[in-house]
Amino acid sequence: MNIPKYQQAQVQGQQPNLQAQQILLQQLQQGQSQQSQPSIGGSGSAGQFSQQDIYNDNIAQQGLYQNSYQRPVQAQQPPQLQNIHQQQQFFPQQFSSQQQNQPQASSLQQYQQQQQQQQQQQQQQQQQQQQQQQQQQQQQPQIHLPQQYQQSQGQQVPHQPPHIQQQQFFNQQAAALQQQQQQQQQQQQQQQQPAQKLNSINIENPNSIYWQHQQQLCQLSRNANIPHYYARQYAANSRKNKNPYSDVKTVSLIDATRSIVSALNEQENSKSNPGSATNSALLQNKKLAQDLDDDHLQEEQRMRQKTQGRQLWCQLDLSGQGLVNLSPKLFQYDFLESLYLNNNKLTSVPPIVNKLRSLRTLDLSHNRINEVPSELGMCFNLRYLYLFDNNIKTLPNEFGNLIELLFLGIEGNPIDLKIANLVAEKGTKELIAYLRDLKPSFSKPPPRQWLLLEDDGEIIDPINNPDAYTNDNNNSDTNDTFTMMSYNTLCQHYATTKMYKYTPSWALEWGFRRAALQEEVLHFKSDLVCMQEVETRTFHEFWVPVMQGFGYKGVFFNKTRSKTMSESDSKKVDGCATFYKTDKFELLHKQNFEYNSVCMGSDKYKKTKDLFNRFMNKDNIALITYFNHIQTGEKILFVNTHLHWDPAFNDVKTLQVGILLEELRTIMKKYHHTNSIDEIKNASMVICGDFNSTKENAVYQLFSTGAVSNHEDLEGRDYGKFTDEGFRHSFKLKSAYDHVGELPFTTISPAFTDAIDYIWYSTPTLQVKGLLGKIDEEYSSHCIGFPNAHFPSDHIPLVTKFQIKKSGGNKKPDFKPDFKPDFKSGSSRKT
């Protein structure tokens, strides 16, 4: 026991007396056993610490140590009372014998009475202070020690040495400070966030697996209520990742959601593939663990490629900041992939949120949001959307565009029971499908504007020169003009719900799309119609009868893979179809052009490794038709083609076009019965179709400039002279829509939106007089992809009006014109 030095001297000096007193005390006790002994350390005795003796200092007044350990007030006692306390503390037996034989001094009794009065006054003051502290509790947090450290009024404080008392007091302070910090955080959260809604939605089946997930994740979200929760947790887990001896990482709301989604997917896969259920069950834990990090790894790799190794942050945590409104500048950060706005005071979300189309995670939980904007449906990359504990009553139909959404948190909202029950029974994906199949909330767009062009290519303003458009409508059928359409109609075998998840199921049905395609094609009354992705059976059984009723005849050629199929399966293969009005054009010749067959049948194309591995396994084709324009006698060659789709094979597309242009020179010589290069250059020709190439690709450059070399699309490839010397052609070609800088897009989807369809024409003999303009911008801003309720294909049609510059025509060929369409799929070119 550690005793101060001045007390040690006192104890050592009184050791002999202490032993004598103990012997005397035993004798007295034996001789006076019948006499009652006064209690030692009873109530009001000076031998113990008084419960009412507390320091009257600032700490006590502020209530920081309320209900805590009470300290003895030795500084307020007179010297004689201090001596009595010391004797009782260090010599209890001696003090006990004196208490039996000697009465207390009257002065000491008077002092004790005064002391009791002071203690009563202090009790009253302390009660008043407690009332004031309760009123100021939010401003000045209190420290409440654990129950084991608190004492009642009548309880005696056990005697402990000073150093043990000091250690206990320090432990009490540490526990009190820790509890104070927790109370401060709770009070701060209560001040910043609105009252939580802990009542669940009254659904029909609250025990369903999907609704249990809602409640579990909602509770986890409610617990994540500290400011910058996600940022703090990310930083903590990052530190744990660097330390191999650290604890297991804490699971966040996002991680828990990923685990739940992975488990559900595993169950669905096991049901669809019962034979592999055992193996899937064995790998379940591994798969779940991988799924937690797969998205992060893929995103990091994608961002590295996007930023070329530069660091770019893509997550923003504004949770628990008491935000009432959001600045419009926030939505200029269109690179954001995760945005956390939970535990704020937001009452609405601005419609400008649709600019954040890279968002994958959005947390709006624990706010005061009354309505979700329909523009949020444009954030089609969202995978996790948390709306827990708000005032949302319904969801907009545009949420059907959230094709990647894996989980939608709606617990804690007074939401429509129809929506809540659907989520509880079938989950988030079925809810999105239900909303997608509802009637579209936006109306049909206005018709695409028809644009007239001057001879120099300038667009005629319909406001300043309305007569030009009136005359064009009245005199549309002039002798030296013709109109043509190029349209990828989307083969019905490609129009699946898996491929076009953003399209309502009823809008993908072939019956609906077929009627809409027929209406759109016949609406423009084009003299010549070139279609791509037309099924073989559909051409013969649908398009030929329909088009014949409006004065058209047609020719068709399907893709080369049909040669390896049975007769029934080959009818499902798509190809290119060309329809022409018999009163405008006379068909002179038709040729089926197979890119791979032409390449293999000619010695001028070097058979390289890239040719066999990348080019030969593609079955793309072109349909070549040679017409006589009846009014003028002009011979015009039309090429209708569909190139390979994959952007990873841009070199293959370039080679396909290079071979096509190379062979067209020979074909033109044959049709025109001439070997003159100048005559071939000035011949009338139109090449249209789906080229699956943008303006930046080598295909566009080859058409527009006549040559391409050292392009990134061809880098590292070997195609003989084409890559050694570059691609070249002698035709003078121009894009019909080059007069308007090309359309903003000819195909639109969540993954890709751009112009990839073109109409190329020979400038020496033809000029553009009219174009079908772009789709209404307001309408397209609310669409994430075609087809939809108003557009039956994933492409839009291109319509152009051409004028033949020269009158008359070349001499007709000696062979008899072929009026009968050739429906055979074999190539007419001998190789």
UniProtKB/Swiss-Prot annotation:
Gene3D superfamilies: Endonuclease/exonuclease/phosphatase (3.60.10.10), Ribonuclease Inhibitor (3.80.10.10). One of its GO terms (cellular component) is Cdc73/Paf1 complex. LRR repeats lie at residues 311-333, 335-356, 358-379, 381-402, 404-426. GO terms for molecular function: metal ion binding; poly(A)-specific ribonuclease activity; RNA binding. Mg(2+) binds at E533. Pfam families: Exo_endo_phos, LRR_1, LRR_4. It catalyses: Exonucleolytic cleavage of poly(A) to 5'-AMP. Coiled coil: none annotated. InterPro entries: CCR4/nocturin_mRNA_transcr, Endo/exonu/phosph_ase_sf, Endo/exonuclease/phosphatase, Leu-rich_rpt, Leu-rich_rpt_4, Leu-rich_rpt_typical-subtyp, LRR_dom_sf. The keyword Transport does not apply. Keywords: Cytoplasm, Exonuclease, Hydrolase, Leucine-rich repeat, Magnesium, Metal-binding, Nuclease, Nucleus, Repeat, RNA-binding, Transcription, Transcription regulation. Its cofactor is Mg(2+). GO terms for biological process: DNA replication; DNA replication checkpoint signaling; nuclear-transcribed mRNA poly(A) tail shortening; positive regulation of transcription elongation by RNA polymerase II; transcription elongation by RNA polymerase II; traversing start control point of mitotic cell cycle. Residues 29-50, 142-163, 806-831 are annotated as: Disordered. It is found in: Cytoplasm; Nucleus. The keyword Transcription regulation applies. Residues 811-823 have a biased composition (Basic and acidic residues). Its EC number is 3.1.13.4. Acts as a catalytic component of the CCR4-NOT core complex, which in the nucleus seems to be a general transcription factor, and in the cytoplasm the major mRNA deadenylase involved in mRNA turnover. Ccr4 has 3'-5' RNase activity with a strong preference for polyadenylated substrates and also low exonuclease activity towards single-stranded DNA. Belongs to the CCR4/nocturin family. This is CCR4-Not complex 3'-5'-exoribonuclease subunit Ccr4. It comes from Debaryomyces hansenii (strain ATCC 36239 / CBS 767 / BCRC 21394 / JCM 1990 / NBRC 0083 / IGC 2968).
